[in-house]
C-alpha cells in the first residue's frame, strides 16, 4: 500500500504542469468565444428592429380592420338602405 501511495504523489506534480498549460489555452479560447457571443447579440437587436416595423403595421392593420369592420357594420346598413331605393 505504501508503494501505491508513492506514485500518485509523484504523478500529482506532473499533473500540475499540464493544468498550468491548460488555463493558457482556455484563456485563448475564451476570447474568441466572447467575440462570437457578441456578434449574434448585435444581429438579434437588428433583426428585432427590422421585424418590429413589419409586425407593428400588420398588428395595426388587424386592429384597423377590426375597428373598420365595426364602423362599417354600423354604417353599412344605413348605406345599403340609402343605396337600395336609388337602385
Swiss-Prot record:
Species in which this protein is naturally found: Trypanosoma cruzi
Keyword entries, A-Z: Chromosome, DNA-binding, Nucleus
Highest classification ranks of the organism: Eukaryota, Discoba, Euglenozoa, Kinetoplastea, Metakinetoplastina
GO cellular component assignments: nucleosome; nucleus
Record-linked InterPro entries: H1/H5
Keyword tRNA-binding set for record: no
Compartments it resides in: Nucleus; Chromosome
Annotated protein name in UniProt: Histone H1.C6/H1.C9
Primary location recorded for the protein, binned into one broad class: nucleus
Top-level taxon of the source organism: Eukaryota
Region (Disordered): 1-87
Keyword Nucleus assigned: yes
Listed GO biological process terms: nucleosome assembly
Chain intervals with Basic residues compositional bias: 11-87
One Gene Ontology MF term: DNA binding
Amino acid at each position: 500500500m505504501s508503494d501505491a501511495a508513492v506514485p500518485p504523489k509523484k504523478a500529482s506534480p506532473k499533473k500540475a504542469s499540464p493544468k498550468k498549460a491548460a488555463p493558457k489555452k482556455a484563456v485563448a479560447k475564451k476570447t474568441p468565444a466572447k467575440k462570437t457571443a457578441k456578434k449574434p447579440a448585435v444581429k438579434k437587436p437588428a433583426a428585432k428592429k427590422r421585424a418590429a416595423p413589419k409586425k407593428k403595421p400588420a398588428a395595426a392593420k388587424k386592429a384597423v380592420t377590426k375597428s373598420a369592420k365595426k364602423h362599417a357594420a354600423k354604417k353599412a346598413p344605413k348605406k345599403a338602405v340609402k343605396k337600395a331605393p336609388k337602385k
